[in-house]
Amino acid sequence: CIYPMYDFAHPIGDALEGISHSLCSLEYEIHRPLYDWVVEHSQSMLPARPRQIEFARLNMTRTVMSKRKLRALVMGGYVKGWDDPRMPTLSGLRRRGCTAAAIRDFVSRIGLSKADSTVDTALLDACIRDDLGEKAARVMAVLHPLKVVLTNWDADKTLTLTVENHPKHPEMGSHTVTFGRELYIEQEDFMEVPAKKFQRMYPGFEVRLNGAYIVKCEGCKKDENGNVTEVYCTVDMDSLSGSEGADRKIKGKTLHWVSAADAVPFEARLYDPLLADDSALEDETEPTAEDAVDAEETEEAEEADANLSRADYDFLKKLNQHSLTVVRGVIEPYAKECAPGTALQFLRTGYFCKDPDSTAELPVFNRTVGLRDAFAKAAK
């Protein structure tokens, strides 16, 4: 009896399951004549006549695609499971915030080929941006907060501002934010002594606070180590967005902010590619029979360390040690109420997805993709 030898079981199983096209990687090309032979000689007994098509495996820059290497990452504790947002698994991509539409767009763009090639992850990022750019509501979140005090604003005065969820899609509605005497901005948006062409906040310079007023920086306060802890500004009361005075032209940029009065602490998980460079991708072939036996042994051991000494796993030395950075910031209350899996654009920062690890006290957001490909820029 030859059943269930793979070359016999594969076409019969496909036919019984109603498969029309069996898509395989290139190493199965030499098996196709036998696949076709079995289908041809079993046609009278099978409900369908499947066809095998081969294509080159998908390789992506700075991304581990080999199943055995991905398993080593999981079993060795280098990632937090198969759904870790750094993993190229469907569950990992979903948790990262990648949408099904973005994946379909990516697959459509790269197509099928029999030529070995490596696709830049920037293409997948672009597909994600294109999709989320149309779907994600805009919110303000500050990852590295710096307090701003508006010295000519009454301490007990607050203003409720209405902001659109999406500038191009009014049908997505709006939400409110609170404006008051104390706010938070990003630390990088202030410089006591500005660099050349710096057009954000510094003493004597005006900027606009998104959806609110034009403010002028008057000075700052430092701690004993010389670190800026507070920035002092005055408000142009006639410059509220939507009013006549809002048309006044200034040289400064528009900054995002979060009111200190109702700021919600949150955790941001900033993900970057798992590999520091592409040199670890030189051998992404599937395992031999001997490798498969080793994989079974690791399953029994419940950890990968027993096999990580093999030359196969030298790629672990080339992991990006900064593939995950966790920061604590503040975000507007609207984002706290979103359900896990909700995609948002943090203004001027990137696209984020609310993680299932979120609690009532501490929302957690995973960075899906930045507004630009910062990793590729830094690698040049």
For the regions a language model picked out, list residue spans one by one.
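Alpha-helical recognition segments enriched in aromatics with Gly/Pro capping
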Residues: 1-112, 153, 354
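Basic, alpha-helical terminal appendages of large translation-related enzymes
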Residues: 79-80, 90, 95-105, 110-380
